Every structure is written in C-alpha cells, then in structure tokens.
Amino acid sequence: MKASIKDFEIMAPVGSRESLAAAIQAGADSIYFGIESLNMRARSANTFTINDLREIAQICDEHAIKSYLTINTIIYDEDIALMRTIVEAAKEAGISAVIAADVAVMAYCNEIGQEVHLSTQLNISNAEVLKFYARFADVVVLARELNLKQVKVIYDTIQNEQIKGPKGELVRIEMFCHGALCMAVSGKCYLSLHEMNASANRGACMQICRRAYEVKDKESDIELEVDNKYIMSPKDLKTIHFMDEMIEAGVRVFKIEGRARGPEYVRTVVECYKDAIRSYLEGTFTEEKKLGWDERLKTVFNRGFWNGYYLGQRLGEWSRNYGSEATERKVYVGKGIKYFSNIGVAEFLVEAAEMKVGDKLLITGPTTGAVFFTPDEARVDLKPVDVVRKGQHVSFKVPEKIRPSDKLYKLVSPQELKNK
C-alpha cells in the first residue's frame, strides 16, 4: 500500500510557549517537552511545570497535534514518588505519550494505561532488544549510532515477525533527523558530572564538550598540534538531503533536537522537513529543493552540519567554532505595542537598535510563535520613513496577528554584526 502523509510524523522540540506556537505554525505533527526535573533538558529548557500539562494537551488537541512528555532521565528511588505523580498528571491531562528511558517509568505508564515511547537513551541497536521492549512501547527511538542498513534490518524484522506494542499495532521506528548531537553514545555522557558535578543523565548537562581544548603530553609538557580545538563538540545532524533513504529504511517518526533553541529555529526546521516528506511522497524530492532547504536551515542556530552515522561512520566532523554558525543572527529591536486587526498593521516601540525598510525582521511571542517578514514600508507618526531610530514608535504591515509585548528582532549576517 502506498504511503501517505499521515504515515509520518515530524516531531518538534518545545522548550517554551514561543516554540510551541512556532511548532503549530510550521505544521508539526507532534511536539515533545519536559517538566520539573526528570527530563534531559531540565537545566536548559525548564519553562514548564506540572500545572501546564492540561493546557499544553488542550492546545495540541485543538490543532490535532500529538503531545509527548519526556521523563527520560536516570530514576533513583527518591524520584519514584515524583515520577508517579508526573505520569498520573500526564494521564489525567490527556498527554498523548510519555517518552521514557527507565523501566520503572515504562512499567508505571503501562500499569495506569498511559502510552509510552522509548528514548534514545536506551541505545536500542538490534531487533532482539526491540522485541523485549515492545511489551512496553508502541514507538521506539533507535540508537543514533546505527546506520540506515541496520535500521532497515530492524524495520524488516518488525514487519516480518509482526512485532507489536501494547496497542496491538506494529512498533513504529523514530529517529533523530536534525539538531545537536552529543559526543557520547546515545547521549549517555558522564563528562559534565565528572567536571562540574552536574549530571547530563539527570538533565543538568553543562556542555563541557562544547569548549575548546588543548592537548598536551603530561611527561614532556609539549602541546600536541591538533587541527581543531573543539575536539569533543560534534557538528549538528542534518538528514534532509537523504530523507528518502530514511523513509525507505523504515523511519516513520522524525525527531528534531532543540528544546533549548528559539522559536525561529523550530518554525524553520519543521517547515523544511515537513516539506521534504511531502516532496518525497509527491515525487518532487529534487536536488534543487535540497539546496533551498539547506539555505534555510543554515539561517538558524547550528554548529555546522554532518550526516551523523546514518550513511556510515565519518571521522573529523567536529565544530570549528564555539556556538552557532547560523548565517543570520538576531538583534533585538523592540516590543509590540498594538495590533490593528482591521488593516493588518502592528505598532512597535523601538528600544534597542534602529531598523530600516527592507530589513528582514522576526517577531516572537508566547502566542505569536515566530513570524518572518520584510517590510516595504514603515511609518512613524503616520509619516513614511526609511529608518526608525531608538525611542520611536513604528507601524508597518505584518503577515500574521501579533500581540502586545511580542519581541521584534532584525536578522543580520554575522559579518554585519561583527562590524558594528
């Protein structure tokens, strides 16, 4: 039977309300997020609490989006009570599934009837392990160290042996398709704990691997020459140019990494990958389109790109710089004051940096999400102007509704930012 768009999911990372709105705008099929302390981004994207579960589930239901709650850290005995409280709250709120890495979480989800998906932290690398865990889960994230030939073997085994999850349906394969990669196997790293007493496996990673390092011989004190000081900081994963191979290997849920990244990242990446799947199904997955997606993906946060291990292991794929290599950088301009719905015009107070007609702009907000546009006209005191300076109120047409206190940014090149 020919596959349809409904057979696939683009799963968006949500670490803030702005990112949730951006995921909806971009057409995400599902979102994943964490609350409290038992998730792998507890330190870097800790904006939601247990009290937000019902609202998040309701928002997702209204937009026909599945909601996945991550409870994927190591669980100690002292965590059991909190874990059960969170799982029960997720069940009561109507969260679609819990993403788990600990059998205690899986077992309790099964006990109370909460759907569970398995995290990459489990490092599932073969069909026999998948068979074991299928008693708990309907969707499995395979180890990100696998190549696509290995993924295809697991997919074929699921089909041939009819391996089913608790719902009685064939287990679906989920894989990371884009975003940050950890230098450790399936993200199980102990460097942050060793150096900073902050465990990555408890959601408190301090990103020690992203720093620059020098290599010295301890006996001679001679520094060894290395071509790159970021020797533990991998480039970001990008699979959009071989999405056809991912699909044919059996991947059905495409997970985007990035709960600590901004709403502009979420909207851009989700739109690109959603378009890639649609193009594959329509037979228009062309080199020209790949180039277009590449250019868009470069504009938002990235550390450079590589294929991961999916097409076979490659060495030397390390970041060249600290932080982002995005071709566009955000510069804060000001905040939203008012939206005139009858004419589609927004008013902003310019607080931090001047802007001019023709600048590429970005508006973000908890309900607005991420809106990109380039104004061809701007007015101050109802008069057309080319440049708007700090302290002035400016109005211009916007493509979507905005809200008071939304943030206005202009997008500039790294070189332009450096020259200021």
Where are these regions (language model features)?
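Surface-exposed amphipathic alpha-helical tracts and adjacent flexible/coil segments at the periphery
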Residues: 1-26, 30-42, 56-57, 63-73, ...
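Charged helix-capping and loop-helix junction motifs
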Residues: 46-52, 81-86
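Well-ordered mid-protein domain cores that form the structural environment of catalytic cofactors
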Residues: 83-119
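Short, glycine/polar-rich helix-capping loops at beta-to-alpha or helix-loop-helix junctions
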Residues: 125-130
